[in-house]
């Protein structure tokens, strides 16, 4: 975003907030500014606030709330002491039931505005655990010389800075309550300036921390990590380089996995693998997707962007055959191992870059009844344009970005003869503005 070069006038102003933006900020049009839009962090629709400008650009301004003069009835006191500074979650001031209402509204607005489509039915919002749900994430680590301390946390609203966290209530408690201990541990290390980030991931029986370090750890620092792991019940992995450089420090064998009891499936994973962040919502989402797909015992299903087999293996318990395709060869290898470990011989997996031409791929010509896809934020348009879509009776699309879903929905409905039967939001990331959603398409 191009910002003006003039010195920013930070004089607070009073304004009425009319809407909530897709990223969770209040929207106002300032009098005396020609109706120019201002996005205000910490403000809610229907409120009268005092706001301090933080940035100006040609088309809109940005500000932060410094006082609430007339509060929305939906405003609540944020649980977290770092709300308003940390960017980890920006909706804690909005009553929980209204957060998902706002996300449904963002989804429908995107479908209509970008895709020019409207679902025949709006699915009830899917919700799971609201606190202590985040089982995977990345903390930034920074040694701040001016403060003479090490900070561990998520980025601040101003992403140049790392939030100095004392606790995080959205992260699983075993990690969220130990952030100050992590910061103190690193502060006492020889290589405290050489650790830029810590990744965390939790299975059902183990929690792992992966330490990215730019220089080899001293023996003293290695032992400090081992002692910390033993005292607090963590597995520690070291990452001196890229993803392939990750190796266990302690213990040497770590049983990282999660179970899906409804499907009698267990999925093993590695410390940097992608898994769904919210365990309780993930189980509901899988059941939701399988039901919406109307999967039947004689069906052959194609599962694109399948990862470890999060949807593929439960589907294998229901249908005749399922084929999973994923761009990450490591995840495909783990998916195959998971299928074998769970005794599922009707699940096949292929590694393929789904943004590239796959029309000659063997899996493309196998013939399927139904399609399930769970693409990254960029969506699935490249592969949708290659698929023999006329062969699919039904498509279930799980999305982590409403904009790309809307674009792809427009393609399916307006160009390929599908009906958008239903769509709805799923609250994978409570208290954040992130919108996870699911949509169902049927051939007309």
UniProtKB/Swiss-Prot annotation:
Keywords: 4Fe-4S, Iron, Iron-sulfur, Metal-binding, Methyltransferase, rRNA processing, S-adenosyl-L-methionine, Transferase
Residues of the TRAM domain: 5-67
InterPro entries linked: 23S_rRNA_MeTrfase_RlmD (IPR001566), MeTrfase_TrmA_AS (IPR030390), MeTrfase_TrmA_CS (IPR030391), NA-bd_OB-fold (IPR012340), SAM-dependent_MTases_sf (IPR029063), TRAM_dom (IPR002792), U5_MeTrfase_fam (IPR010280)
Gene Ontology BP annotations: rRNA base methylation
Entry annotation: catalytic residues: 400 (nucleophile)
Reactions listed under catalytic activity: uridine(1939) in 23S rRNA + S-adenosyl-L-methionine = 5-methyluridine(1939) in 23S rRNA + S-adenosyl-L-homocysteine + H(+)
Annotated signal peptide: none
EC supergroup of this enzyme: transferase
HAMAP family per UniProt: 23SrRNA_methyltr_RlmD
Name the record gives this protein: 23S rRNA (uracil(1939)-C(5))-methyltransferase RlmD
UniProt source species: Xanthomonas axonopodis pv. citri (strain 306)
């Amino acid at each position: 975003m191009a910002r003006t070069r003039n010195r920013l006038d930070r004089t607070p102003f009073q304004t009425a907030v009319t809407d909530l933006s897709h990223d969770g900020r209040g929207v106002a049009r300032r009098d005396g500014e020609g109706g120019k839009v201002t996005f205000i962090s910490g403000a809610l629709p229907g409120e009268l606030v005092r706001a301090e400008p933080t940035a100006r650009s040609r088309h809109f301004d940005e500000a932060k709330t410094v006082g609430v003069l007339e509060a929305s009835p939906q405003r609540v006191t944020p649980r977290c002491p770092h709300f308003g500074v940390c960017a980890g979650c920006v909706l804690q001031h909005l009553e929980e039931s209204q957060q998902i209402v706002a996300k449904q509204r963002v989804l429908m607005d995107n479908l209509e505005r970008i895709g020019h489509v409207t679902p025949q039915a709006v699915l009830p919002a899917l919700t799971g655990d609201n606190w202590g749900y985040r089982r995977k994430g990345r903390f930034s680590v920074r040694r701040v010389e001016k403060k003479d301390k090490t900070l561990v946390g998520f980025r601040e609203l101003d992403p140049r800075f790392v939030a100095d966290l004392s606790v995080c209530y959205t992260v699983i408690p075993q990690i969220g309550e130990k952030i100050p201990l992590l910061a103190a541990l690193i502060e006492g290390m020889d290589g405290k300036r050489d650790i830029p980030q810590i990744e965390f991931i939790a299975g059902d029986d183990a929690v792992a921390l992966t330490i990215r370090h730019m220089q080899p750890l001293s023996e003293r620092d290695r032992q400090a990590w081992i002692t910390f792991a033993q005292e607090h019940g963590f597995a520690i992995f070291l990452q001196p380089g890229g993803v392939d450089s990750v190796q266990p420090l302690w213990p040497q064998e770590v049983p990282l996995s999660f179970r899906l009891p409804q499907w009698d499936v267990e999925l093993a994973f590695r410390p940097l693998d992608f898994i769904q962040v919210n365990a309780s919502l993930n189980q509901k989402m899988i059941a939701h997707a399988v039901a919406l797909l109307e999967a039947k015992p004689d069906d052959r299903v194609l599962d694109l962007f399948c990862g470890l087999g999060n949807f593929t293996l439960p589907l294998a318990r229901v249908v005749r055959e399922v084929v999973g395709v994923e761009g990450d060869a490591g995840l495909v290898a783990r998916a195959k191992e998971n299928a074998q470990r769970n005794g599922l011989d009707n699940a096949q997996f292929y590694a393929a870059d789904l943004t590239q031409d796959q029309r000659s791929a063997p899996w493309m010509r196998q013939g399927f009844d139904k399609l399930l896809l769970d693409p990254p934020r960029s969506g699935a348009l490249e592969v949708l344009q290659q698929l023999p879509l006329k062969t699919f009776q039904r498509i279930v699309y799980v999305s982590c970005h409403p904009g790309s879903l809307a674009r792809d929905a427009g393609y399916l409905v307006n160009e390929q003869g599908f009906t958008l039967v239903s769509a709805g939001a799923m609250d994978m990331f409570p208290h954040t503005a992130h919108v996870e959603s699911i949509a169902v398409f049927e051939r007309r």
